[in-house]
Amino acid sequence: MRLIKRFFKSVGVLLLLQVAAVNAELNDKEAALKAGFLFNFARYSDWQVAATPVGYFKLCSPDSDFLDTASWVLHQQTIHGLGIKVALVELDSLNINQCNLLFVTHRYREQWVTTDKSLLLHTMLVGETPDFIKLGGHIRFFLASGKIRFEVAPESLKKADIVMSSKVLRLSRIVKEGEQ
């Protein structure tokens, strides 16, 4: 009897590990897709004023798990002739003003609320929480019918001196000022 209980406990643990592995794989896939979206957002946008010209395009996030995936996905890619540097940043650090694009995952929403947005005047701001654009962001990811979609606040991008291609904007849900 003890052997049977031990067997079923082992099977239960294995099933839990399998579910955890599947969830981790889905999270990696979602992060990889979002990294690809970020690449294309940057590729099809023009910065009228560079955040800080340093000889490379700097994609930042406070989320090290996302950055691990993004580093792999964006390896040896270029944006406007510049290599991509993926960087871990603290949202309360002055270093965020050196980012061309900042991606804030849902885990860092509370820190985003208190982030000094004046440090990010010419940085493309992308997030994934429902209120991200309302809290000063430019682009927000959301899920619709199990697919990753995005919405853009073009007027907010314009204030940051960033112009996004009309082709990309046509693929998005547009958020107008006051609708946020």
Residue map of PLM features:
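N-terminal signal peptide c-region/cleavage motif recognized by signal peptidases
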Residues: 17-21
